[in-house]
């Protein structure tokens, strides 16, 4: 089952305006994350950075009770490193890394078919933060409790880096 991924009309320029399809085909409403810090990360199962799933899961397990959420978005945009179906992806993530953080349906994060959420994340005219581009799998967008982008983290930076952990725990 395929759900249309959409954005609600909103003047708040935040990720809270988005509803997307999760990896099981259910609606995931970002407005339910108001008051939580969020890491949005594009993922791939056949990438040299796939090992980051382990650190993402550890980070999620450690901080999920501290108003922190990780949202994974599988993408096949970089050297076709996420070729599988949603079913293949979640099976891989659960069996190999014990992933329990929310995973969304596979999307496009660059180019003319870029998903509306990633249009928001990468365009200053929409996010009021800065223009950016997704450079590779496992790029991280750190979103504050108001749904605004605060930091964009390189794909090569480990999810459990001091920079990210400090951001999560700041203000706790």
Predicted segments — roles?
Residues 22, 42-46:
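Amphipathic alpha-helical repeat scaffolds
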């Amino acid at each position: 089952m395929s759900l249309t991924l959409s954005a609600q009309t909103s003047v708040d320029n935040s990720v809270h305006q988005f509803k997307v399809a999760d990896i099981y085909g259910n609606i995931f409403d970002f407005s339910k994350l108001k008051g939580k810090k969020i890491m949005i990360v594009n993922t791939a199962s056949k990438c040299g950075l796939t090992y980051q799933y382990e650190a993402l899961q550890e980070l999620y397990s450690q901080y999920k009770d501290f108003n922190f959420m990780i949202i994974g978005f599988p993408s096949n945009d970089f050297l076709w490193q996420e070729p599988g179906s949603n079913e293949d992806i979640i099976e891989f993530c659960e069996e190999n890394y014990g992933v329990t953080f929310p995973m969304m349906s596979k999307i496009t994060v660059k180019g003319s078919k870029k998903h509306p959420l990633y249009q928001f994340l990468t365009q200053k005219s929409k996010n009021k933060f800065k223009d950016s581009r997704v450079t590779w799998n496992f790029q991280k967008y750190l979103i504050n409790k108001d749904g605004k982008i605060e930091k964009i983290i390189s794909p090569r930076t480990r999810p459990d880096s001091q920079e990210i952990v400090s951001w999560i725990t700041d203000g706790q």
